[in-house]
Amino acid sequence: MASHILVLHGPNLNLLGQREPGIYGTVTLASINQSLEALAQELGVTIECLQSNHEGVLVDAIQGALGRAQGILINPAAYTHTSVALRDAIAAVALPTVEVHLSNIHQREAFRHHSYIAPVAIGQIAGFGADSYLLGLRALVNYLQQKANS
């Protein structure tokens, strides 16, 4: 059975392409999702994408992934630095999770340097624009394949 990956996009990512293009680029969220779908097919996995500006919706999606998905790819956006709830949900479901960011959060304002998600993720990819998502999906699928073969 092919692996199923839950892809979560946090607050304000619905505005990609128009929001602060100097930081986040001009690629839209729809375009990122299309690229992820194409890569998922190439890698032999399925994905389900969800964007929400609401923390509880994201928590519900993470909890709902239990028994349905083998991994989570998440850009928590601003919730990276504030959400113990997302961190606890990821820890609770114990699914391999990769955290991604379009910008390099460690080169930005000091308050963006801390991630509540990173300690419960298998890895973090930041600073490669929309490619961060593709790199994250590749890394997650590779991790799942290695785990299945061990």
Curated annotation (Swiss-Prot):
SUPFAM superfamilies on file: Type II 3-dehydroquinate dehydratase
Catalysed reactions, semicolon-separated: 3-dehydroquinate = 3-dehydroshikimate + H2O
Chain's role: Catalyzes a trans-dehydration via an enolate intermediate.
Catalytic residues (UniProt): Y24, H101
Top EC category: lyase
GO BP terms in the entry: amino acid biosynthetic process; aromatic amino acid family biosynthetic process; chorismate biosynthetic process; quinate catabolic process
Family: Belongs to the type-II 3-dehydroquinase family.
Residues flagged as site, Transition state stabilizer: R19
Subunit and partners: Homododecamer.
InterPro entries linked: DHquinase_II, DHquinase_II_CS, DHquinase_II_sf
Keywords: Amino-acid biosynthesis, Aromatic amino acid biosynthesis, Lyase
One annotated GO molecular function: 3-dehydroquinate dehydratase activity
Pathway: Metabolic intermediate biosynthesis; chorismate biosynthesis; chorismate from D-erythrose 4-phosphate and phosphoenolpyruvate: step 3/7
Protein name: 3-dehydroquinate dehydratase
Enzyme Commission code(s) on record: 4.2.1.10
Binding-site list for substrate: N75, H81, D88, L102, S103, R112
A Pfam match: DHquinase_II
